Amino acid sequence: MYTRSISEPPDSIVKSGQPVFGDFTPAPKTLDIRKLEQPFSIMPLPAFITNWRIRANLCFTFLTPEFFGTMEIIDAHFFDFAEINIWERSSGKKLSFRSFILLRRRIIPLTIISGICTSLKKKRVFIIRWDYTKGTFSFLCRLKGDTHRADVSFSFSGDLQNEYSLCNTSIIPAPVMRRCAAVHHLSLPLKGSFSLQYRSALQNVPLTRKAQPGAAQSEPDAAKAENWGFFTVRRSYYRLRSHCQSLTVLGTADGVPIRFNLYTSNQDPFDPDLYNENVLFAAGETTPLPPVTITHPYGLNGQWIIQDTESMIDLSFFPVSDTVRKKSILILRTEYHTIYGKCEGTVRDKHGTKFTLKDFCAVAKKQYLRL
């Protein structure tokens, strides 16, 4: 059975100018990779130049009984971009909001043990705050709609000290050993509220059921929670041309909460069996997953096939709704697909336990960037 060892995090993920590769838990203090010594071996370059090749991404995916959503923030030094997509699970109806954030030095913090990511634009307000030392996580968001889109307001909170709140940090080559990518994954049960306000009516969707008056109050069982979040922060050196594919899946199989993330790109390490960021959180345990191959032989809107060579992952993804954003300015070209759909198949944990997925909510992403 495939496995990778998970160890205690080092004091710094860069020591003596070299990255410390591996999988770590709990969370390290920072994801700062700027101190690498000569990450580009073509010629000696000052740090202020090589640091411009570092970009950061933050992604938060959430699942509730009625809705499935994902938020992605791109920190590209000279500009930041945020996109939130929300789908109604019963109908597949989509709400999409985008925001350019200019003249911000760094929207995604370097620290990971605690941090805050905010945007206070009038029509796009979001605040993401986490603190592992206090065991707190919160996400507040208010989005102003228009005649075709509802106003969206939601707030989530989670307990990072809960036994089902699991995290994993991977430091991997990108793709050579001189450069690295630092990726932090967190999965946790959520509580909070969610509301949609249309121009003609108000639809409120509570995430937690209130106890009847006079009933005894008790702590909910996190294993039976219906609301889950998957939080990812990635900081990496990028090529001038980069493309990647990913799949994030959340759901419950036979009463066991299942959450995992699969990722592959043209910056995968030369030895992906030894270093990769794929991870499964199931039954209160963390399982490093092997590298995968993601193909879509029937087109992006047809069935996707996700498999590995270790017989741990055998999945099919069926797209429901594709959100596309394309930009082309001089030599800059981007093409991002954020696809909501259903996932079916099987996945195994490190003990060989087989989980069968049926009608799981998932979001797949296919991204291309040329600078």
Short names for language-model regions:
Residues 1-371:
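Structured soluble/peripheral alpha/beta segments that form catalytic or ligand/cofactor-binding pockets
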